[in-house]
């Protein structure tokens, strides 16, 4: 790990947290992922060996704890790791407000999008009985064009293969459109009205889709307005 050669606490924190992928791994831990495979779903373009290296470094730095047996480790945030939560949230909110660029194809990832949605959609919006929502992304890579979110008894499951249940709602759109909705670049209902998103199913369910889907937590935070400022007596 390269050093900035500075005693400044910011520089020392950056030496640890600003290595490629490190802060994204911390984001996944803050979001609730505790197992290697679950963390990997949030960083699908990160190699397993690099993820292992970053987790090892975070353990050595005291940011996370590793427990369990080899091959079945559980990772949890330490006190130091938990204190990163507001930092990560503000970093993401700042990114939503100031670092957003137009989405390019390289930025689009159906697996990451659906995994993020799976842990954020609000199951309380739908009845407690099983509700199956199918997502179709015709322009996504082969093998990532169809996804199913199954809402039942307050739980959400994500399936890449047909779960074999009756589908209640079908949502069909370009991957970029749903990504824009998820990151609050446009509203779901507005995209439906424009014809960018096609929705099929019971109107009692489709009318609630915008509330059910919600949006990226970091984008929601960034959309709230001006971020808090810390007192820094610069002259």
Which residues fall in each region the model found?
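N-terminal helix-turn-helix DNA-binding core of bacterial DNA-binding proteins
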Residues: 8-46
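Feature captures hydrophobic
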Residues: 37-38, 45-235
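A generic alpha-helix surface/boundary motif
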Residues: 7-8, 172
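N-terminal intrinsically disordered/low-complexity leader segments
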Residues: 1-6
